């Protein structure tokens, strides 16, 4: 049974892209693997956060994890800040990382571009991410392809530590799903769908009302050709919608293309909206049951307890290898 770790920031709503790129596959992975699913709230504070809203976002994300099918009897669901070893190992991994390689991270360059003042946390985000993963002897990390560079750095840092001190860390493998790994914006289909996009029409939230979902899909940018065909380079808009349809329906892109041969985008978009609405309806129902229930707190308490046991043990191995731990007389 392989160990799997994955984390999502509680920085606003969860999009269709988050669900298809990560959460949907989690429900399958938990049946065959030892899974740790972490709400990485310490990563969220690398940008300014309102304390009240952040607290709400953490709880909302936890409820969505369970509503999407995460079973606390099979997987460990917890909040990053409730396991102190994450921040402790994050500092240690900063001492292993080099400033140059951190500055080369694409996400850092994108977020720091054009800013007069750049929080140090944006630069040191990857070592903390590495710590998140390495604390649990993680073997597989399911991520969207936009996180591939950070994962490669995690592997580099783990190998560097193992060579410099001793073999402590398991080198994690990257798993990127074939379909739905990168859901694009509905308004600018050459960009990733993002919860931070200022245009609300660009993304679908997992908590959007059915009518809102229908409006967003029907207004999604396509092209003037009117043929439902996958062509990422020349038809990025319709290709993105085909990816979403395929991910929710279980049908291949080719099967969907055949279904809409001779039909226009209007029919396709209308049907896609219904597919999405029906797929996320039970998730929304379960979310509403959980969000204010003591059951959710019990799940998070239990998850933090288990994560702390495992993480503390690994942190002690790291400290022993580095000579940080005190030998008692």
Curated annotation (Swiss-Prot):
InterPro entries: aa-tRNA-synth_I_CS, aa-tRNA-synth_Ic, Rossmann-like_a/b/a_fold, Trp-tRNA-ligase, Trp-tRNA-ligase_bac-type, Trp-tRNA_synthetase. ATP binds at residues 9-11, 17-18, 144-146, 183, 192-196. Its main location: cytoplasm. This is Tryptophan--tRNA ligase. Belongs to the class-I aminoacyl-tRNA synthetase family. Catalyzes the attachment of tryptophan to tRNA(Trp). Its EC number is 6.1.1.2. The gene is trpS.
